[in-house]
């Protein structure tokens, strides 16, 4: 297995710049692993594939307004801050753009455009991979000073920032959306609940590494990024109950899948128990899934860890066939793109 095995060519015009409207009008490519059939559907028709008692696991992490514009106090130069994760009281790991000549001790002034609330950030230290450690003088209004960051391949402004949030987003912490969940509407979730589907939630805060290609020739040499997650006792109980009664667990997105598999991998007493901590499980082809029976996901970047996880679930030859079909039939790719359901 080589990283180059997970490469494919995608014309730029296939990268969706705007979300489908309404959310559940996006296309859905259904992959049946048993029959190796590929079926074109609309996402709102996904209810056809559920049965009463099935469990739907979704990631309720909310994207932070993590992109903040500031002015360097010493030079008056403009600078952009991208918050990555909190590191203690008032402290955050962040990427700065531009980052050159921004040494420890640099003060950055941050103001609302209308002259309202403000704060200062002090660069405390350099960390790995161009990451800086910042301390903010006042953290209370920090979330009001920024805007939601969009992926680097989306070049069109989004009229409504909430379209880059799931309708069930609850807990601030991600810098990228759990995009497989963007297709669900409140009405669709209501229909699933009325069918007897058990809708449950986990929280996994997604970092920027989700967009980064694996550079090592052998993916096993890649150091997977860590993301903080929480899986409640109630969600673990729902999953165990489904497994014990012959029902299926549908995981929405690579983030939810990764967390439930991590929790199951670490569980000492049963299939899965409640969990809170870092998720660093790297799922590659050959991995035996313990929790996920069915998988809802978007179309992923070449050489990315989400693509490798999806390949582990579907099998790369079958998944490649699905990607070739999606490209030939003009499916929309990446964060605002269409989805697939793998059965």
Swiss-Prot record:
Its main location: cytoplasm. InterPro entries: QueA, QueA_dom1, QueA_dom2, QueA_sf. It is an enzyme of class 2 (transferase). GO terms for molecular function: S-adenosylmethionine:tRNA ribosyltransferase-isomerase activity. GO terms for biological process: queuosine biosynthetic process; tRNA wobble guanine modification. GO terms for cellular component: cytoplasm. It holds the Pfam family Queuosine_synth. It catalyses: 7-aminomethyl-7-carbaguanosine(34) in tRNA + S-adenosyl-L-methionine = epoxyqueuosine(34) in tRNA + adenine + L-methionine + 2 H(+). Keywords: Cytoplasm, Queuosine biosynthesis, S-adenosyl-L-methionine, Transferase. Monomer. Transfers and isomerizes the ribose moiety from AdoMet to the 7-aminomethyl group of 7-deazaguanine (preQ1-tRNA) to give epoxyqueuosine (oQ-tRNA). This is S-adenosylmethionine:tRNA ribosyltransferase-isomerase. It comes from Dehalococcoides mccartyi (strain ATCC BAA-2100 / JCM 16839 / KCTC 5957 / BAV1). The gene is queA.
